[in-house]
Amino acid sequence: MPHYLARSTRPDDPIEPGGKIIIAGHGRFGGIINRMLSSAGHATTVIDYSSEHLEALRTFGFQVHFGDATRPDLLQAAGIAEARLLVIAINDKAKITELVRYALHTYPDLHVLARAIDRDHVYELWAAGCRDIVRETYDSSIRAGRSALQALGLNPRQATRIADEFERLDRASMPVLANLYRLDTPPHLNAPYVAKV
């Protein structure tokens, strides 16, 4: 049994679709996305499995629902068939990939934005058909790298130029490497992948 299901025997909340956007997971990643979308006037339907976390969010006026967002019946109740966007922000690599596969297979016109736990996970999600993938620590790492360059004596403009160029090259290489990545082969044993890294 997944660890999060053992936390509570509470039944799933009944869901009345609140918008054309479903956010699966409302932790430190999904919560920021939901706040940003809400501040721009977008109604969302949020599904999370942390009962205590959701009760706290309700006190701040967020529309949240308890349940396992990877369950097809719960997604259907949330209105996935009419949704414009599914944001997958849960913190479980295997569950994210599973949900991406299900959503894109069942709803091929749905835009899926998926959280990637690490670089290898980006490739798994790419292989599953997702094309809008966000590495959870990527942007903060770029900012930290820029700060490190400044701490080493580069002026802010030079540090920004280096960080921007690194990001441009890294983003350009991602689809190329994703197409060479093999789920059944460790990256260091995949000669075509290694040749491009």
Regions found by a protein language model. Give the residues of each.
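Cytosolic regulatory regions of ion transport systems
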Residues: 1-197
